[in-house]
Structures are given as C-alpha cells and as structure tokens.
Amino acid sequence: VRDGYIAKPENCAHHCFPGSSGCDTLCKENGGTGGHCGFKVGHGTACWCNALPDKVGIIVDGVKCH
C-alpha cells in the first residue's frame, strides 16, 4: 500500500479539476482510502491517491507519458 499520483497506462496522469470529487471517487474505486486533485510537475493537474494497493500503477518519476 502506498500514496501517489495514480497512473493511466504508459505512466500518464489522470487529469482533474481542483476541488472536484473526481479524484476521491477514482482512488476509492481503485482500492485507495481517498484522494484529491494535485499538481505534478511535468504532468499538470493529476489525481493524488492515499493508500493505493501495490497492484495499482502510480506515476514513476523520470519516465515520460507516451
């Protein structure tokens, strides 16, 4: 279990709108305890999740979205 920016395939961010409930819902649907919209350098707005299961991908620093 770990916290991080949940990733789409190919290390891409789930973009979001600050203040919306979309990230919290996405994180919970993927087994996390909740989340919010944050900002990830190089990706822009992105969903940050708390306590995601290890099987759920998170953004890896230094790897470009492709």
From Swiss-Prot:
Family: Belongs to the long (4 C-C) scorpion toxin superfamily. Sodium channel inhibitor family. Alpha subfamily.
GO biological process, one term: defense response
Protein purpose: Alpha toxins bind voltage-independently at site-3 of sodium channels (Nav) and inhibit the inactivation of the activated channels, thereby blocking neuronal transmission. This toxin is highly toxic to insects and mice, and inhibits the binding of alpha-toxin to cockroach neuronal membranes.
Tissues and organs where the protein is expressed, per its UniProt entry: Expressed by the venom gland.
Protein name: Alpha-like toxin Lqh7
Disulfide bridge map: C12-C65, C16-C37, C23-C47, C27-C49
Location(s) in or outside the cell: Secreted
Gene Ontology CC terms: extracellular region
Superkingdom field: Eukaryota
Keywords, comma-separated and alphabetical: Disulfide bond, Ion channel impairing toxin, Neurotoxin, Secreted, Toxin, Voltage-gated sodium channel impairing toxin
MF GO annotations: sodium channel inhibitor activity; toxin activity
InterPro entries attached to this UniProt entry: LCN-type_CS_alpha_beta_dom, Scorpion_toxin-like, Scorpion_toxin-like_sf, Scorpion_toxinL, Scorpion_toxinL/defensin
All residue ranges annotated as the LCN-type CS-alpha/beta domain in the record: 2-66
Domain comment, as recorded: Has the structural arrangement of an alpha-helix connected to antiparallel beta-sheets by disulfide bonds (CS-alpha/beta).
Pfam families linked to this entry: Toxin_3
Principal subcellular localization: secreted
Organism: Leiurus hebraeus
